[in-house]
Design a protein with these regions (language model features):
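Short, Lys/Arg-enriched N-terminal segments with co-localized hydrophobic residues
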Residues: 1-8
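Acidic, contiguous N-terminal accessory segments
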Residues: 18, 24-154
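Short, linear, compositionally biased motifs with a strong N-terminal bias
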Residues: 18-19, 211
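A periodicity- and composition-biased signal for non-globular, repetitive helical segments
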Residues: 16-17, 194
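Sec-dependent signal peptide recognition
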Residues: 10-16
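Feature activates predominantly on carbohydrate-active enzymes
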Residues: 98-221
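Intrinsically disordered, low-complexity sequence elements enriched in Ser/Thr/Gly/Pro
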Residues: 8-9, 27
Length: 221
């Protein structure tokens, strides 16, 4: 029996070693964010977002749209009941902070998350990072993150001229673009030689774009 026990332990040892390695790797795993930030340092503890107070500083007027996005973090998550907390989420707009365009700095502590950017786009993208970091209960790991885009144009194309999609699909497409911090939506609406769709906000699309006087084979005049 002693020999059998020794043999069994020898067989179990590789499995135990693999499990220990996996646990250690999971503990050291960096933040899983898309796209990967320029700098990210994980800290001990977490920030409980549900029930937190959202405040904004440095804006010319109350940023209602950004506060709506932040409120998704403050809302109850999963089956957790609404709870009262003194935790705060600060959105701080500071053009003198030296942060590149569309970039942000994020500091998450146990009772306060502070998001700073030089423009509103940076605040928005920082909120997308917080949404990615939150677990099913709305807990966000404490961390310090600095991020800004390498490219000014980060786009995605959608062709609805040849392939038709419902409105809800297009809205979901835009939501996923925002989550990935893409900032240009290339909407392929028509394959006609002239622009046919009237959009009142952009009248020159039809005033100018619907007409042309010349083509490769001569003039229409």
């Amino acid at each position: 029996p002693a020999g059998q026990n020794t043999c069994a332990m020898k067989k179990l040892f590789p499995l135990i070693a693999v499990l220990a390695t996996l646990c250690a790797t999971a503990a050291q795993r960096p933040l899983q964010l898309i796209p990967q930030p320029v700098r990210a340092e994980l800290r001990e503890g977490h920030f409980a977002a549900p029930g937190c107070k959202v405040t904004a500083e440095g804006f010319a007027s109350r940023p209602e749209g950004l506060i709506r996005v932040a409120s998704a973090l403050a809302a109850p998550h999963g089956k957790q009941p609404a709870r009262k907390t003194r935790n705060t989420l600060l959105l701080q707009l500071d053009a003198r902070a030296g942060i590149p365009a569309e970039g942000y700095r994020l500091r998450v502590a146990e009772h306060e998350a502070e998001l700073t950017a030089g423009d509103e786009s940076g605040i928005f993208y920082g909120l997308q990072t917080l949404l990615q970091m939150a677990d099913a209960d709305g807990n966000i790991p404490c961390a310090e993150i600095e991020d800004y885009p390498r490219y000014g144009y980060r786009g995605l194309h959608l062709d609805v001229c040849r392939h038709f999609f419902p409105v809800e699909f297009v809205k979901g497409y835009l939501d996923r673009m925002a989550a990935a911090k893409l900032n240009r939506f290339h909407w392929h609406l028509t394959d006609d030689q002239g622009w046919r769709i009237e959009i009142k906000r952009y009248p020159r699309l039809t005033q100018v774009g619907a007409w042309r006087s010349k083509s490769q084979i001569g003039s229409y005049e």
